[in-house]
């Protein structure tokens, strides 16, 4: 089954299910994508941190925390969340605000934002608090008959359940939905070419961008005239504009230009390149006929933490003596086979899985020591491992599509652990271009 070209660009070359795609469209309205955070936190009534439940509709998480900080007249650093949620979605999550009076929250009136005080804590809301997310997602505008829709949903679900889940790919959001450039920038950084990296991010045009944006990028790409570029770059391209301002003041300091960006953004470039390599290794492993749910000698296996989630810091290599015991743990969901997100100090598999990993690194000419980035140590990565299989048990229902008269909609519900992508599950059902899912 043919995979969309844009997915091939991010290292995804296959589907794990053989059933024909449902087609359809996601996010026709915001409520079609509902996300509820699952955490292990229980709040009390004491502590410096005010803990709130945040329900937001069609808000970017970072934009919202910036807005809240402005209203409350506090530093944005005092507001923390356990995870960034989708923008075009209805999402529920916990946030914490340091040293703020609960009464001040009552004065916040933002469209499509609801804040409810849950209590206080001595500890801020952090990434470690997040277990996962519950999703309820509506696929609309499906052209098949009711009988065909039920059949396709049932067959795909049965395939997913039979293989205990889907490949744990990094989804298109990791790379940029309209402009999948993150991993290309990261590759140039790891290769030590900061000029190429900066120009890719600032000036590489993509066909699905608005025309004025494409033209502005093309101008800077051809002329390297950042002063003129600032005059024509749309104001919403704030990160690119900040980098150009730095380069006007500090010509040729391409490495330094990245450090004017928010830390979570500039770290995403190297992570994006690692994610691209991981996606390719995962596909090659499947093409080689290696299981994602049964270890072979040489596999690096990680174990579950106290919450039952994969812990990539606890790994062990399967040997002739241990592989059967490890597979018993894998069947009980207490252990998980992994693939590398390579860095300058990564543990690689041996045996046949190791050959797959090494072949991809050789083919891509990945300079592992390049992940130790002297110019910008903040971007360096020693690497880690990530579980190959995204264990998921989707449930579905079919109903009349009230937004598209005469058609039906499918509603999927499932839970995913943190760090995984709902679109990785949805792509197996829909089998469409990722832009129809964004």
Curated annotation (Swiss-Prot):
* Active site per database record: 86
* Pfam families cross-referenced by the UniProt entry: TruD
Instruction: Supply the alphabetized keyword list.
Output: Isomerase, tRNA processing
Q: Which terms does the UniProt entry file under GO BP?
A: tRNA pseudouridine synthesis
Q: According to the lineage, what is the superkingdom?
A: Archaea
Classification via PROSITE patterns: TRUD, UPF0024
Domain (TRUD): residue spans on this chain: 165-390
Question: What is catalysed by this protein?
Answer: uridine(13) in tRNA = pseudouridine(13) in tRNA
Q: Cross-referenced Gene3D superfamilies, in alphabetical order?
A: 1.10.1510.30, 3.30.70.3160, TruD, catalytic domain (3.30.2350.20)
Q: Which GO terms describe its molecular function?
A: RNA binding; tRNA pseudouridine(13) synthase activity
Entry EC no(s): 5.4.99.27
Q: What does this protein do?
A: Could be responsible for synthesis of pseudouridine from uracil-13 in transfer RNAs.
List the PANTHER family hit by this protein, alphabetically.
Answer: PSEUDOURIDYLATE SYNTHASE PUS7L, TRNA PSEUDOURIDINE SYNTHASE D
* Recorded family membership: Belongs to the pseudouridine synthase TruD family.
Q: What is this protein called?
A: Probable tRNA pseudouridine synthase D
Organism, scientific name: Methanosarcina barkeri (strain Fusaro / DSM 804)
